[in-house]
C-alpha cells in the first residue's frame, strides 16, 4: 500500500513538472528571439555605385557584422540590397554603406523595413563581377553566417571575403580575387 501511494505521488509530481516545462518553454524561446533584436531592411543605393566595388563593400559589412541578406545591381545603375540581423549592427553597416567606396560618388541610400526571414542564413552578392580584377563572368558570392554570432575586426573581414570569393570563382578567374597578388 505504501509503495502504491509513493508511486502515485511520483507520477503526480512528474506530471506537474511536465506541465510547468511545457508552459515555460514557449516563453523562453520567445525571449531569445527578442534578446537577439533581429530586424531586416531593404535598400537601394543610387549614384556612381556600379563597377566601383560597392556590392563587395556591402558584403564585407555583412561579414563584419554577421548579417544575412543580398546585394544586386539594378539595370538603372543602382544597387539593391537587404540586410537582416541585429538592429544595432545593421545601423553600423548602413553608416559605412552610406559613405560609399573610394571609387563611388554621389551615394544616396534609401531604406525601408523588410520582413524577417527565419531561414535566411547567408549574405549573397548576386552576379558579382570585378572590373579591377578582370573577372567578367558573373558569380554568386555567398557568405554563410558565423556561429557564434559575433562582430569581427576589419582586418579579419578581408581574409574571409577572399576565401569565399575564391570558392565562388571558377576556371580562368581562379586566383584573381586578391588584387594584391594579381600581376
Each model region followed by its residue ranges:
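Intrinsically disordered, low-complexity, mixed-charge
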Residues: 15-22, 26-183
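Bacterial N-terminal signal peptides that target proteins for export
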Residues: 2-14
Amino acid at each position: 500500500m505504501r509503495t502504491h501511494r509513493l508511486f502515485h505521488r511520483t507520477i503526480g509530481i512528474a506530471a506537474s513538472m511536465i506541465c510547468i516545462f511545457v508552459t515555460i518553454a514557449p516563453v523562453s524561446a520567445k525571449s531569445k528571439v527578442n534578446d537577439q533584436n533581429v530586424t531586416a531592411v531593404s535598400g537601394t543605393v543610387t549614384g556612381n555605385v556600379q563597377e566601383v566595388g560597392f556590392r563587395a563593400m556591402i558584403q564585407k559589412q555583412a561579414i563584419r557584422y554577421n548579417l544575412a541578406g543580398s546585394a544586386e545591381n539594378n539595370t538603372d545603375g543602382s544597387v539593391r540590397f537587404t540586410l537582416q540581423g541585429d538592429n544595432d549592427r545593421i545601423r553600423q553597416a548602413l553608416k559605412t554603406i552610406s559613405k560609399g567606396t573610394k571609387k563611388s560618388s554621389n551615394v544616396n541610400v534609401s531604406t525601408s523595413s523588410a520582413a524577417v526571414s527565419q531561414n535566411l542564413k547567408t549574405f549573397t552578392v548576386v552576379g558579382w563581377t570585378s572590373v579591377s580584377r578582370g573577372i567578367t563572368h558573373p558569380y554568386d558570392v555567398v557568405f554563410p553566417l558565423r556561429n557564434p554570432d559575433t562582430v569581427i575586426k576589419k582586418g579579419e573581414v578581408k581574409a574571409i571575403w577572399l576565401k569565399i570569393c575564391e570558392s565562388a570563382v571558377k576556371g580562368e578567374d581562379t586566383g584573381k580575387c586578391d588584387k594584391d597578388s594579381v600581376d
